[in-house]
Design a protein with these regions (language model features):
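Nucleic-acid endonuclease domains
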Residues: 1-92, 99-187
Length: 187
């Protein structure tokens, strides 16, 4: 199956929410990302996967910042530590993660997903622009995936992650009420 970005992503872009991140907040994000990357130099799996690491952390944090604005909650964890301390969903109090990717790339996800992800795209034209695309349920994440979307051969070889292309099945996210069914402790 051939998957191209325009067919899988761009054709749905009129449904995405545009979020501008303030320049001073973007600067704080860049500084945090630098501290994180410096700390990751001590972790073996980060020594193996050094390609564009600073840019990836900035991109991920920008998605979190965009959702902070959209949902009017604090999301970014400003602490720096070992990766194993950070294996939990991104949105505090909710079983919801955030996947942010550069424009013209597909989000990389785990092959088996247990909680939803809000998918975001970082603009390639404006440094501080993020598109909030929508929420992918675990069923959607687990169905619409392809290893062919992984560009990095080393990551593909590890076999734990895959590319996501189910933008046609994303649920819109306009506010925190859209996530209530994923609130920790709710039935």
């Amino acid at each position: 199956m051939s998957l191209d970005y325009n067919t899988c992503v761009t054709r749905y872009s009129d449904q995405f929410k545009k979020i501008l991140i303030a320049p001073d907040y973007l600067q704080k994000i860049q500084e945090l990302a630098s501290r994180i990357v410096e700390r990751k130099l001590t972790e073996v799996h980060h020594l193996v996967d050094r390609n564009q690491e600073l840019k990836r952390f900035i991109t991920g944090l920008m998605g979190e910042a965009a959702l902070e604005q959209l949902l009017d909650i604090n999301i970014i964890d400003w602490t720096v530590g070992d990766s194993y301390h950070y294996h939990y969903p991104d949105i505090p109090g909710y079983k919801v993660g955030i996947k942010t990717v550069e424009r013209n790339k597909f989000p990389i996800i785990f092959k088996k997903n247990w909680y939803p992800q809000i998918i975001c795209i970082r603009s390639d034209k404006f440094e501080n622009l993020v598109f909030v695309c929508g929420l992918a349920t675990p069923d959607v994440l687990n169905e619409f995936q392809s290893d062919d979307l992984i560009v990095d051969p080393a990551l593909r070889k590890r076999g734990t992650k895959t590319g996501f292309y189910g933008f046609s099945r994303l649920k819109p996210v306009s506010g925190i009420s859209d996530l209530y069914s994923y609130k920790i402790g709710s039935k």
